[in-house]
């Protein structure tokens, strides 16, 4: 069945171009367009699209306000278009706070110069988002800044029942330590193929926690990091697929919400306990055995800048078995090869479970490759990090 898309933008040119690009994919049908947030709400209610593309700056009602109304009245995955500026980054993070799933830079130059690349990226996003699991969670909300409850109530964006306790049937165990060989079969059916044990991975003197993520990552990272205490004993490195103009604003926002310190990484930064360094967009981040960070130019041959595999690989080389790595929600398979290197030197690899992912791509790649030592629900990862490291 084709993915139904509603295109919302006050620019006639942009509406037409997005419609043309999406209509070229046989799996996508544009069911309607809107010129402002008010029309977007009306069209969403009438057409019930699978995905909505949304501009921010529009007359009558802006995109963020429209997203909030849509999430309250007819929850639908929203892909935001945003400008590549610091203000655009702030607005985009606000949109994710309101409930949007993901974003793309609104770059008219790219549409003209690289139409095939734009088509591939946009259509891939739409198709993936249409299959996504939605969770209500806000960046910057007061509730999100507090540790998540052990068994959260279902939200307006999720029909999932509350996670059962460890005593409940195994089919819905939200957090489990998995024998690597059993992981793929267990996760695919939500029922372990072999007996598994609930609880936290074996405690080890970790020298580094490395977390990689993509689509859905800004919200997921906030969920995890806000549960860590100020005295968290290990340094952290964060790799989030994000444009260069966005990572500084995102790091600043996380720093305000978290008890630990968070900053955009700079070349020569020193790793220290209770500090999370976010890889800068458009570049690559590596760590060395002296406990310092190296920031390198983004390699055009690589799809991702920053790339989880690059950072994980350097961590494996520099810290051996003293790395605890976590792969969160995201499209694609970035992180799999880096996790493979980490496993080869004896480090620990965790993956987010399918039910709590916005896009079950990167964690699925870890699980299918039999690299996951444990699979945890998003709400449980922060707690398990504390238990494993403190």
From Swiss-Prot:
PANTHER family: PROTEIN-GLUTAMATE METHYLESTERASE/PROTEIN-GLUTAMINE GLUTAMINASE, PROTEIN-GLUTAMATE METHYLESTERASE_PROTEIN-GLUTAMINE GLUTAMINASE 1
Protein name: Protein-glutamate methylesterase/protein-glutamine glutaminase 1
Chief place where the protein resides: cytoplasm
Gene Ontology molecular functions: phosphorelay response regulator activity; protein-glutamate methylesterase activity; protein-glutamine glutaminase activity
Role summary: Involved in chemotaxis. Part of a chemotaxis signal transduction system that modulates chemotaxis in response to various stimuli. Catalyzes the demethylation of specific methylglutamate residues introduced into the chemoreceptors (methyl-accepting chemotaxis proteins or MCP) by CheR. Also mediates the irreversible deamidation of specific glutamine residues to glutamic acid.
SUPFAM superfamilies, alphabetized: CheY-like (SSF52172), Methylesterase CheB, C-terminal domain (SSF52738)
Keywords: Chemotaxis, Cytoplasm, Hydrolase, Phosphoprotein
Active-site residues annotated for this sequence: 214, 241, 334
Family: Belongs to the CheB family.
GO cellular component: cytoplasm
Organism: Pseudomonas syringae pv. tomato (strain ATCC BAA-871 / DC3000)
Domain CheB-type methylesterase: 195-387
């Amino acid at each position: 069945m084709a993915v139904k898309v509603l295109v919302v933008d006050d620019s006639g040119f942009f509406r037409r171009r997005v419609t043309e690009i999406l209509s070229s994919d046989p799996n996508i049908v544009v069911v309607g367009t809107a010129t402002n947030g008010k029309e977007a709400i009306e069209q969403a209610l009438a057409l019930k699209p699978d995905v909505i593309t949304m501009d921010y700056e529009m007359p009558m009602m802006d995109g963020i306000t429209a997203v909030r109304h849509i999430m309250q009245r007819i929850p639908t995955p929203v892909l935001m278009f945003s400008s590549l500026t610091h203000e655009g980054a702030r607005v985009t993070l606000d949109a994710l706070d309101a409930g949007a799933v993901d974003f793309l830079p609104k770059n008219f130059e790219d549409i003209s110069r690289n139409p095939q690349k734009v088509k591939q990226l946009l259509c891939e996003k739409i198709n993936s988002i249409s299959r996504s699991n939605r969770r209500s969670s806000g960046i910057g909300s007061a509730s999100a800044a507090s540790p998540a409850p052990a068994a959260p109530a279902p939200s307006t964006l999720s029909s999932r029942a509350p996670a059962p306790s460890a005593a409940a049937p195994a089919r819905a165990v939200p957090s489990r330590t998995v024998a690597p060989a059993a992981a793929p079969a267990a996760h695919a059916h939500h029922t372990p193929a072999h007996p598994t044990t609930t609880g936290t991975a074996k405690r080890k003197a970790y020298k580094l926690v490395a977390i990689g993520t993509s689509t859905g990552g800004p919200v997921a990272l906030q969920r995890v990091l806000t549960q860590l205490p100020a005295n968290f004993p290990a340094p952290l490195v964060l790799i989030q697929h994000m444009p260069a103009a966005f990572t500084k604003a995102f790091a600043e926002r996380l720093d305000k919400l978290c008890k630990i310190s968070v900053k955009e990484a700079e070349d020569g930064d020193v790793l220290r306990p209770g500090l999370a360094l976010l890889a800068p967009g458009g570049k690559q981040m590596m760590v060395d055995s002296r406990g310092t960070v190296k920031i390198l130019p983004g390699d055009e041959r690589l799809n991702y800048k920053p790339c989880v595999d690059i950072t994980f690989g350097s961590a494996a080389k520099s810290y051996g078995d003293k790395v605890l790595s976590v792969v969160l929600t995201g499209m694609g398979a970035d992180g799999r090869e880096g996790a493979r290197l980490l496993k080869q030197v004896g480090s620990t690899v965790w993956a987010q479970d399918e039910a709590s992912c916005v896009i079950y791509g990167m964690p699925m790649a870890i699980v299918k490759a039999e690299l996951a030592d444990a699979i945890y629900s998003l709400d449980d990862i922060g707690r398990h990090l504390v238990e494993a490291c403190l």
